[in-house]
Amino acid sequence: MGEIIKYKGFDHVWQYSGPWLYCLIGIYISLPVLAYHILPWIFHKNRSNKRKTISIFVLGDLGHSPRMCYHASSFSKLDYYVNLCGYVETEPSHQIVDDVNIDIIPIEAIKNTNNLPYIMFAILKVVRQCGKIWSILWDTRGSDYIMIQNPPSIPILLIVILFKTVFSRETKLIIDWHNLNYTILNLRYNNLNHPFVKLVKLYEKILGQFANLNITVTKSMKKYLVKEFGFQKSKIVTLYDRPGVQFQPLSNKREFMSEHKLFEDIDIEKYKVLISSTSFTPDEDFNILLDALKNYENTPNTPPILLIVTGKGPLKGKFLETVDKLEFTNKVCVKSAWLSSEDYPKVLACADLGISLHTSSSGIDLPMKIVDFFGCGVPVVSLDFPAIDELVKNKVNGLITNSKSDQTKEVARLVTEVFTDDALLRSIKEGALEESNSRWDENWMQTFSSIFENKS
């Protein structure tokens, strides 16, 4: 019978050990301390005895991201140092550029100049953005807060969570929910069960819960995040969009119109001015408005209309082609304009009526353009969708179409009704002027000053 195997313990292991074994044991024991204490201490910028800092990220053009710029300005007024990071395709307002507390950090806008397939370009764009965003996070490390907007949240939400977890654990994450990323992606696929759409929804649902604070633009969105995404209600605050100080009723309206090139070939005493602003994206169907104006053109006893459409985007060329094909008479004049941040609010204030064709990919966001119109005291006609009544009160500050009716006929009917009924126009104009009294600064301070008050 063979010799019985005897337990000898681990003493024999030390016969083959050396400094390398002690080194490995030391590294293993020190890893948690290194990851959770030493690295953050080394890489965290020393901001002791300094005022608080927030880094605001916008994966879009800063000049056309008013809500995020308003946030930056509001934090500045609380004496925060603000890193405002985003695309600089158009210059932000002077209020932002001239603010000594706000540092604008450009992010390169990556465009598909080589006409790559959508998936290939999307992957390339995400990879390049990851590098740039990480670089900015590194340079601005140690911020008290990081704020991002959603959408878009790919790839920035994941990058920020990883960065703050490893290198900036005291930094708090704020997500400003303008809409839902997956519903916008669904405009491309028109299938909520598409794998990409479901993946993006899961991305938002899981990673969004890492935020210390979620801000929503509507109460409907807050309810959605609680019910569908399982967010904690206590971590969600609704902050309605309100106009900035630059959006005001224009006292010298006729003088401005007589000097601006948009109105130079128009008899401003005869024409009613209709204005809509857009990004020319698929979630706004301008054929509804153009076909409605064709119907209006054939309606007797109605005043002539000047339609001004401001903005730019992928479908602008198609819009202009449609205008040419419709061959409007002098009764309907259509102009497209890309306005500076200084001219835009003044031109809006010249309108007799605003038009919003926004229908919302999610049904729970609201168009900023209507807020801008109200700031200038201009009533609106809006298409109907679930959350619109949180902003537009029918026959009080505007008119809302009947969603069960043909939308082209509805828009034509409402525009005709407003421009042939002076009493109705005066009434909704008064309602819009009443809305203009509610401003961003007061609303933001009332909601957030106690949360973000700089006590350092």
Curated annotation (Swiss-Prot):
Its main location: endoplasmic reticulum. GO terms for cellular component: cytoplasmic side of endoplasmic reticulum membrane; endoplasmic reticulum. GO terms for molecular function: chitobiosyldiphosphodolichol beta-mannosyltransferase activity; mannosyltransferase activity. The keyword Membrane applies. It is found in: Endoplasmic reticulum membrane. Participates in the formation of the lipid-linked precursor oligosaccharide for N-glycosylation. Involved in assembling the dolichol-pyrophosphate-GlcNAc(2)-Man(5) intermediate on the cytoplasmic surface of the ER. This is Chitobiosyldiphosphodolichol beta-mannosyltransferase. It comes from Candida albicans (strain SC5314 / ATCC MYA-2876) (Yeast). The gene is ALG1.
